[in-house]
């Protein structure tokens, strides 16, 4: 498989984690967003949306990290990223959606570039923007962890799930945008537990060949 991605991209990061947890090997192909390589015709031919990540399976090119991770779960069911029961799966998907639907979309690179170019937002304004929405999402995530009677080392129980694939990259982003994580001890504990696993360490932005 060929993974078209960018080292600092949160969506790329979450997919790298999922691939590593599943033990699925892939060829790393860097698409430099800062150099606008994703806007070139060659990449547009792969992914008309011109976003990373994209996963070339040899038979097709998959886009959109949530859909790709669900595809991986179906194609490579072991180890599972979703619980066996419907209630557990709903909870894990809800946690992932807090990040994937409510936090990340309004804090991704193209939104921030639009704020800079159209409204003249400086770095302080960008950090304030990101901090507002990250904190709102983390408030909910932390509260859900706090009331979960089955909470373990990770977001759900004692094995990594889909939720952790989403959470860890968002914590990385929060630190980059100088968000105060003091109010989120449970999130920080989950992030630390994930950081002990090789699958997460190998997926980290700083560990990628195109990191800068």
From Swiss-Prot:
It catalyses: 3-maleylpyruvate = 3-fumarylpyruvate. PROSITE patterns: GST_CTER, GST_NTER. Residues 1-80 form the GST N-terminal domain. Residues 85-212 form the GST C-terminal domain. GO terms for biological process: glutathione metabolic process; L-phenylalanine catabolic process; naphthalene catabolic process. Its EC number is 5.2.1.4. Homodimer. Belongs to the GST superfamily. Zeta family. Catalyzes the GSH-dependent isomerization of maleylpyruvate to fumarylpyruvate which is subsequently processed by NagK to form pyruvate and fumarate. This is Maleylpyruvate isomerase. It comes from Ralstonia sp. The lineage of its organism: Bacteria, Pseudomonadati, Pseudomonadota, Betaproteobacteria, Burkholderiales. The gene is nagL.
């Amino acid at each position: 498989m060929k993974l078209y991605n960018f080292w600092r991209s949160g969506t790329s990061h979450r997919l790298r984690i999922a691939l590593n947890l599943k033990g699925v090997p892939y060829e790393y192909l860097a698409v430099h967003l800062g150099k606008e390589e994703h806007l070139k015709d060659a990449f547009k031919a792969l992914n008309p949306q011109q976003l990373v990540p994209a996963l070339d399976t040899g038979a097709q090119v998959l886009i959109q990290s949530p859909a790709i991770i669900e595809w991986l779960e179906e194609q490579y069911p072991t180890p599972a990223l979703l619980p066996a029961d419907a209630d557990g799966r709903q909870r894990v998907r809800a946690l992932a959606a807090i990040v994937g639907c409510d936090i990340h979309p309004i804090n991704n690179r193209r939104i921030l570039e639009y704020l800079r170019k159209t409204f003249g937002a400086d770095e302080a304004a960008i950090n304030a923007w990101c901090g507002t929405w990250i904190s709102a999402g983390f408030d909910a995530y932390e509260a859900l962890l706090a009331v979960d009677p089955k909470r373990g080392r990770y977001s759900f129980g004692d094995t990594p799930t889909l939720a952790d694939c989403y959470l860890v990259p968002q914590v990385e982003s929060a630190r980059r945008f100088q968000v105060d994580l003091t109010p989120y001890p449970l999130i920080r504990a989950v992030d630390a537990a994930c950081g002990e696993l090789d699958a997460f360490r190998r997926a980290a932005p700083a560990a990628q060949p195109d990191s800068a």
